[in-house]
Swiss-Prot record:
This is Chaperone protein DnaJ. GO terms for molecular function: ATP binding; heat shock protein binding; unfolded protein binding; zinc ion binding. It comes from Syntrophotalea carbinolica (strain DSM 2380 / NBRC 103641 / GraBd1). The gene is dnaJ. Zn(2+) 1 binds at C149, C152, C202, C205. CXXCXGXG motif repeats lie at residues 149-156, 166-173, 188-195, 202-209.
Amino acid sequence: MSKRDYYEVLGVHRNASETEIKKAYRKLAIKYHPDKNAGDKAAEDKFKEISEAYSILSDTQQRVIYDQYGHAGLNGGGGGGGSYSSGGFGGTPFEDLFGDIFGDIFGGRGSQRSRGRRGDDLRYNLSINFEEAAFGLETKIQIPRHQTCGTCDGIGAKPGTTPRVCPTCQGAGQVRVQQGYFSLTRPCPECNGEGQIIDQPCEECHGSGRVRGKRTLSLKIPAGVETGSRLKLSSEGEPGLNGGPPGDLYVVISVQDHPLFQRDGQHVICEIPISFPQAALGCELEVPTLTEKVNVKVTPGTQSGKVIKLQGQGFPSLQGYARGDQLVVLRVEVPTSLTDRQKELLEEFAKEGGEEIHPMGKTFFDKVKELFG
C-alpha cells in the first residue's frame, strides 16, 4: 500500500510555513494521541502517520528532498562533502507538542515560544581530508534555510496592508483563564499567540514572513581540527520569528582516514616496512611526510618497532602552539619464501654466529614417535 502525501496527511498546502505545519501537527496529534484513544487501532495508526509526516516536513533538508523526489527520495543515500540538518542538536516533534501543552498549563511559555522567537540552530556536517585538517582550508558551503520574505519584508502581510493588534489579548499574545483554584496563562486562541492578526497574508510567504531558500557561506577551517570539532557561526541559523534573533549554525568536522598516516593527538604516525638486510646493515630510506619526502637514516642493527622522530611534522594545536612530530615506526619484515641459495646463506650466517639450526623438517608424527618411543 502506497503512502499518502505528507502534506495531505497534515492537511496543509505544499507551500505551508513551518508555523502552519507545526500548528496542524499539534492539532492532529492531540486529537489522535493513544492516551486519548486507548484501544483504538485506527487512531493509533493515524497518530503514527501524522508523526511520520511531521518528522519529515519539519526538517528542512528532508522536506527539500521530499518536495523534489517524493517518498522514493527519502529512501536513498546522499554523497558529497557535507550534509545538513536543522533544529540544532536535540528536539523531537513530541517535545514540541508536549512542551507547548505543559507550557500552556503552567503559564508563560506559550508566549515566549510564539512572540519574538529565536530562530532554530542549524547543523552542517563537513567532511575534509587528512591534509586539510593538518593545515586548514577555506571553502564555501551552501545551507538550505528560511530567509526573510522579500515581498513583505518579513511582516507576513500583503504589501500595502499591515497586521492589526489582536482585540482579544490586546497584543499580549496570551490570555489568562480561571480553572478552579488556578489562574492559567494560555496562548490567545484568536491570534494563536502571535499578538496580531493578518487579515491579508502575503501571497509569497503565506503570512509566515519567511520563504525557503539557500545561503552560501565562506568558511575558514583552522589547522588542527579533528573529527568531532565544532565551529559556531553566530546568527547564521534560521531567522527568528516576529522580530526574534536568528539561530546559530554549527559546522561539525569529520576527518577522512589516510592510507599512510594515523593521528595521535598532535603527532602523526607512519609505519615503514624494512627488510632484514636493511635492518641488520643499516640503510637510508625516503619517508613521506604531510608536505614532502625526507631521507631518514636507519642505523645498523635496528630492531622492529624502533621509532624515529621527525620534529615539527605533525599537527598544530587549535590554540596555535607548535606542531607535533611525525613518528616513523620501523617494521622489520621476515621473508615468507626463500630460494635454496638464500637458505644456504642464512644457515651459514647462523653457524657463523654460533646459532644451532632446527629446520622444521620433522612431521608431527615423527615427534610423537620420538617422545613416546
